[in-house]
From Swiss-Prot:
GO terms for cellular component: small ribosomal subunit. With S4 and S5 plays an important role in translational accuracy. Interacts with and stabilizes bases of the 16S rRNA that are involved in tRNA selection in the A site and with the mRNA backbone. Located at the interface of the 30S and 50S subunits, it traverses the body of the 30S subunit contacting proteins on the other side and probably holding the rRNA structure together. The combined cluster of proteins S8, S12 and S17 appears to hold together the shoulder and platform of the 30S subunit. The keyword Ribosomal protein applies. GO terms for molecular function: rRNA binding; structural constituent of ribosome; tRNA binding. GO terms for biological process: translation. This is Small ribosomal subunit protein uS12. The lineage of its organism: Bacteria, Bacillati, Bacillota, Clostridia, Eubacteriales. The modification 3-methylthioaspartic acid is found at D89. It comes from Clostridium acetobutylicum (strain ATCC 824 / DSM 792 / JCM 1419 / IAM 19013 / LMG 5710 / NBRC 13948 / NRRL B-527 / VKM B-1787 / 2291 / W). HAMAP family: Ribosomal_uS12_B. InterPro entries: NA-bd_OB-fold (IPR012340), Ribosomal_uS12 (IPR006032), Ribosomal_uS12_bac (IPR005679). Keywords: Methylation, Ribonucleoprotein, Ribosomal protein, RNA-binding, rRNA-binding, tRNA-binding.
């Protein structure tokens, strides 16, 4: 424990906050190419087949990203945009793919929360 005079001389070092999405390098989104598209199972107590993609980013990083929404058109060599945001029940998945941009099509027949899934406004009758 430091003395008062030591604190006056040196002060306390502030700990730098650790980034939750280090591969983005302070950018809001990054572009990348899918290397693997597959499904995986979540950890207990959940059960599902979650769609994920391994993405090589333009800065050289390779990350695992979640594909949100029902159905997708992604395959190997698809160009995608990723954003930060982890998936709580998938360990190691810290990024989301942005739907409706580049090669990732928006979710079909989506009526609510459309902007989050890149869905266009449905035609009025």
């Amino acid at each position: 424990m430091p003395t008062i005079s030591q604190l006056v001389r040196k002060g306390r070092k502030t700990l730098a906050a650790k980034s939750t999405a280090p591969a983005l390098k302070e950018c809001p989104q990054k572009r990348g190419v899918c290397t693997v598209v597959k499904t995986t199972t979540p950890k207990k107590p959940n059960s599902a087949l979650r769609k994920i993609a391994r993405v090589r980013l333009t800065n050289g990083y390779e990350v695992t990203a979640y594909i949100p929404g029902v159905g997708h058109n992604l395959q190997e060599h698809s160009v995608v945009l990723i954003r930060g945001g982890r998936v709580k029940d998938l360990p190691g998945v810290r990024y989301h793919i942005v739907r409706g941009t580049l090669d990732a099509a928006g979710v079909a027949d989506r009526k609510q929360a459309r902007s989050k899934y890149g869905a266009k406004k449905p035609k009025q009758k």
